[in-house]
Structure formats: C-alpha cells, structure tokens
C-alpha cells in the first residue's frame, strides 16, 4: 500500500512534467514547537511521531545520520524511496543547495515556514541526502506549487503555500 503511494507520487511527478520536483505526503508538523517534556526527557510530540510513522520511520537522529524504520515489509520508509529522485535533482548542483518548498496544508491553520521545513531537512540529513542542514550546505526558500521562486518585482504574484484537505504534503525542488 505505501509503496503504491510512493509509485503514484513518482507517476504524479511525471504527469505534471515536473521531473525536477518531488512530493512528500502528509501534513508536515513543526519539529521545534512539537516537543513534550517529561520526567524522562524531551520527546517529539504525538503529532510528529504520527507523521514519522505514516512515512515508515520509527525514529531518526540527524546528528548521527541514523534512521530506524520498521521491519515489516508492508511499512517501507517512504523517505528512503525518494532517494533516487532527490539524487537526480541534486546532480550537478554544488553547495549550498537552494531548496524550494511548497507546503500543501490540510487546513487553513497558520504555520511557521521555517519550523515546518526543519523536520524535512533533518530527515534529509539523517538519510544522508544532504551533508548537513546548516547554511554552508542548504538554504530553504518558499516557492509556488509550480516550482517558481518569488519574483522581486511582485513577491505576492502567487501563493507560497496551498490548502488541500485530501492531499497534504510538501513539494520540493532544488535550485
């Protein structure tokens, strides 16, 4: 089932004729604002844990570059499945990578752009898609759903995020 979703995302990318973009499904939570403090330590919130489980990840550590997936073959790591797409997009581009993000949210709730891309960049680091998510290696920028950057003459020419209750996620493009 999950592999079918990944395949349909890749097909969707081809159908849109935007081979230089990829889509990560799910309403992307804020990692920074989703910490739960307990007597045993600080942990990710249930929202973050639910998102990670939905893409086949039990846990990860971006500093150690480790990702713990599920043994169950019906729950593959969907992020890892996008490695070849990401590496093809990255080919020939040097550091720092300028990574465009277009958030597709499941509601009109306000969100913080920088916090919402933090978990994606941490996952990219943990999966070793990028060396690190600091400014030496990565600059995150908002973009349109079609993969266009902001026009300095008309910065509000198009929406930099959208709402789709049925298909939330994030479009990613490397510039």
How does the language model describe each region?
Residues 1-175:
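Acidic, proline/glycine-enriched N-terminal capping motif
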């Amino acid at each position: 089932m999950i592999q079918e979703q990944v395949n349909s995302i890749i097909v969707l990318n081809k159908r849109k004729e935007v081979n230089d973009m990829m889509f990560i499904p799910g309403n992307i939570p804020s990692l920074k604002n989703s910490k739960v403090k307990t007597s045993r330590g600080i942990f990710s919130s249930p929202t973050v844990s639910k998102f990670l489980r939905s893409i086949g990840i039990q846990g990860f550590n971006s500093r150690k570059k480790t990702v713990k997936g599920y043994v169950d073959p019906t729950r593959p790591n969907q992020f890892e499945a996008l490695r070849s797409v990401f590496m093809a997009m990255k080919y020939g581009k040097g550091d720092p990578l300028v990574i465009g993000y277009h958030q597709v949210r499941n509601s009109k709730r306000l969100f913080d752009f920088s916090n919402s891309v933090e978990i994606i960049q941490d996952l990219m680091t943990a999966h070793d898609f990028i060396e690190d998510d600091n400014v030496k290696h990565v600059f995150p920028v908002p973009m349109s759903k079609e993969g266009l950057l902001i026009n300095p003459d008309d910065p509000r020419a198009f929406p930099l995020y959208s709402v789709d209750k049925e298909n939330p996620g994030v479009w990613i493009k490397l510039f």
